[in-house]
Amino acid sequence: MANPSPHQIYNVTWVITNVQTNTQANATSMLGTLTDAYPTLHVDLCDLVGDTWEPIVLNPTSVRPGAVLLSSSPKYGCKTTDRKKQQQTYPFYVCPGHAPSLGPKGTHCGGAQDGFCAAWGCETTGEAWWKPTSSWDYITVKRGSSPDNSCEGKCNPLVLQFTQKGRQASWDGPKMWGLRLYRTGYDPIALFTVSRQVSTITPPQAMGPNLVLPDQKPPSRQSQTGSKVATQRPQTNESAPRSVGPTTMGPKRIGTGDRLINLVQGTYLALNATDPNKTKDCWLCLVSRPPYYEGIAILGNYSNQTNPPPSCLSTPQHKLTISEVSGQGLCIGTVPKTHQALCNKTQQGHTGAHYLAAPNGTYWACNTGLTPCISMAVLNWTSDFCVLIELWPRVTYHQPEYVYTHFAKAVRFRREPISLTVALMLGGLTVGGIAA
């Protein structure tokens, strides 16, 4: 099975999970490609902590006489309003557990029981006076702003953002981090994972029998009796005709033969409307070997969208490589010298996460495949480039002498006949083609 286009749009959901309670702390969904669907994630610290930061508090009346009461109340946790408010004042730091080999050399960062922060230098992000940072970790975690000053609700917001390394990482499975409060004494630990769930917009086609095979029928013949029946007037002695209810019949499913004939007829109509002199005496032949389609480069006006429009959500059913494109049209990206002949006009694209939607009935032919939309994030981070095309069936145009030679015993001309595809003859004059 061919690899999907990197410009394909998916429904991407990012999930933050509290590891200690195995509960979902946050889920954020968006439409985008696997290259640009990296939103800013928001979660409250208490959703990562739950009840795990609630140390046992001794009742002073139950303390044995002579014992020293070190603390009458904890100053962190999520049980009470006071604890949540006090918790806002503590710095915190975050240590990765997904790649222990990438930590500082000679430093043992421990395991989950240490929050992966068994030694200083293991922390890669956080909100603390020493500004923990990293050049290789996948996320940054900072304190957000809370509109709830009373802390009756959630008032310890955290903001997670993906780094450049995180956008380039493989997210086939969840990745774990440990978060610790920086305080005198023991620094409490919260463990959380970040995972990505990807689903296609278009439901996948079920495997099974080829549905085209039962439709292998020859082209149907036109009925010759329809006009005769319509001109006959029934003989009757009745003074008024009887009303007969209309008979409704469902549309008849045409066979493969009719589909192929319709494809050639549509090509003929397009050619006849463009250059009727060429259709006076010719043969149009549908190519029976792949590639069955070809792309004709055209100039057109695409739309620039910040979010993928509905036209971007479909996956092209046709397959086309850049080598099957001819003509000259609009190119996007950095086009290598080997393909610059396809470009009548070249644009570098746009910065940021934009989607360039091809006009209705057209596609972008990229060196990574066919797509209705270009993700600028993919284009800017890869060596991909694209050409705006119309998609046409490969129907060849022949002079009548070329076909006659197949039935004659001897060749009736000396020079090699020239065969062209109809798409090349039209040169992309009809926006949208006939195969789109």
UniProtKB/Swiss-Prot annotation:
Residues 2-436 are extracellular. Specific enzymatic cleavages in vivo yield mature proteins. Envelope glycoproteins are synthesized as an inactive precursor that is N-glycosylated and processed likely by host cell furin or by a furin-like protease in the Golgi to yield the mature SU and TM proteins. The cleavage site between SU and TM requires the minimal sequence [KR]-X-[KR]-R. A motif (CXXC) lies at residues 282-285. Glycans are attached at N11, N26, N237, N272, N277, N304, N344, N360, N380. It comes from the Viruses. Keywords: Cleavage on pair of basic residues, Disulfide bond, Fusion of virus membrane with host cell membrane, Fusion of virus membrane with host membrane, Glycoprotein, Host cell membrane, Host membrane, Host-virus interaction, Membrane, Signal, Viral attachment to host cell, Viral envelope protein, Viral penetration into host cytoplasm, Virion, Virus entry into host cell. Pfam families: TLV_coat (PF00429). Residues 1 form the signal peptide. Residues 219-240 have a biased composition (Polar residues). This is Envelope glycoprotein.
